[in-house]
UniProtKB/Swiss-Prot annotation:
Residues 345-505 form the Helicase C-terminal domain. Residues 18-53 have a biased composition (Low complexity). GO terms for biological process: mRNA processing; mRNA transport; negative regulation of translation; P-body assembly; stress granule assembly. The lineage of its organism: Eukaryota, Viridiplantae, Streptophyta, Embryophyta, Tracheophyta. Belongs to the DEAD box helicase family. DDX6/DHH1 subfamily. Residues 165-335 form the Helicase ATP-binding domain. InterPro entries: DEAD/DEAH_box_helicase_dom, Helicase_ATP-bd, Helicase_C-like, P-loop_NTPase, RNA-helicase_DEAD-box_CS, RNA_helicase_DEAD_Q_motif. ATP-dependent RNA helicase involved in mRNA turnover, and more specifically in mRNA decapping. The Q motif is unique to and characteristic of the DEAD box family of RNA helicases and controls ATP binding and hydrolysis. Residues 54-64 have a biased composition (Basic residues). This is DEAD-box ATP-dependent RNA helicase 8. It comes from the Eukaryota.
Amino acid sequence: MDPRARYPPGIGNGRGGNPNYYNRGPPLQQQHNHHQQQQTSAPHHQQYVQRQPQQHHHHNHHQQHQQQQQQWLRRNQIAREAAGTDRNSEPKAVAQSPAVDGIDSSSQDWKAQLKLPPQDTRYRTEDVTATKGNEFEDYFLKRELLMGIYEKGFERPSPIQEESIPIALTGSDILARAKNGTGKTAAFCIPALEKIDQEKNAIQVVILVPTRELALQTSQVCKELGKHLKIQVMVTTGGTSLKDDIIRLYQPVHLLVGTPGRILDLTKKGICILKDCSMLIMDEADKLLSPEFQPSVEQLIRYLPASRQILMFSATFPVTVKEFKDKYLPKPYVINLMDELTLKGITQFYAFVEERQKVHCLNTLFSKLQINQSIIFCNSVNRVELLAKKITELGYSCFYIHAKMLQDHRNRVFHDFRNGACRNLVCTDLFTRGIDIQAVNVVINFDFPKTAETYLHRVGRSGRFGHLGLAVNLITYEDRFNLYRIEQELGTEIKPIPPQIDQAIYCQ
């Protein structure tokens, strides 16, 4: 790895401060000509007149170095004179880097200049606070990347970030298992952004996700973390215009986020070139290795170079993941932070109801609970639309989303709900994977899920990043066996709902 890429311009051996970095700016001869023109208009700088070229070619390299050094010295001298400083003072060899969005990234007090969001004072569980005490600076990240991390509101790494960031930076394959809502997205986005060479116009990182909404969310996180870097992020998913994606890929793209089918389609057409892609990240890896996606994922890997690095992240790892790991990740670094499956901050209740009483029960929950935002899960598209209509008739604001909606409509609903335009969202399991909306503190399973895996991902939509949350399950007579089985599989306790629920367990 080029050591200059470890520092931002103007710091250490960074491109901005290294006089030996010959590829910077116009060719040397042009610089020399420009320098001579400036000498005629600025006679008081004659002490920096460059020596005439010597005839002995073994001095060429030394002379190039000297000319570059003089250019740097003279540039600093002019800058100081413009600022009204003493002309006779000794110029420094290191140039200051340009300010990024009004922030001088080379300044020693760069942290004080950041526009930090308000501090989140809510209670957090040990799912995200039980760390080793590391700081983001300990990983020697680019200064501009650190600026984006802090401006995103991150204070210090969560446990999954502490484990995965340094290992990913070494180039090792990773198989990481951590709970929903503990910071997995940043755990792979940060090393991906750090390893991208901004000067190289090629796709260097591909992030695969199973749903379109998760692709949009992940690309947004990458853009926010890398906003001070010159890294081009692109998102591509099925259901959107293929023509627009093709046009976009003719422009520079460093990091590509998308669903496997669409990226494979663009790759087969020869539009998406992956020969320089050194890192493949699989978020929600267990879903990506389901029969629906696995053939596309395996075909896509064939287009990557043999030296590629694969990072796999998920909360659950079934047998299919082990088979894939044995084939494509011979010696991965394994991270397992799953001492238990459900988040510590989520309190789970069930209520026995008859099918015809469910809407009435939901109305009672709305009136008694202190809801910031809630997600209500149904098992079918038809039931989603019917329930959303019922909730609206009861006088509560409500959106709904499911897989049969047009992609533009889905995007709009997702965006509006995330921005707080509505308090309640009714949806199918489309919305269970990776969707991170911090304001959601209540999840209601209007229809109880059939599998423990689905249940785990549903309730994980509340209590994000160590905050408190509440999951309420409406259980019919037919669901009682499922309830018992899921409790056993997850090793968790789902309690009967009490007459009054203490707000402190989900609103602190």
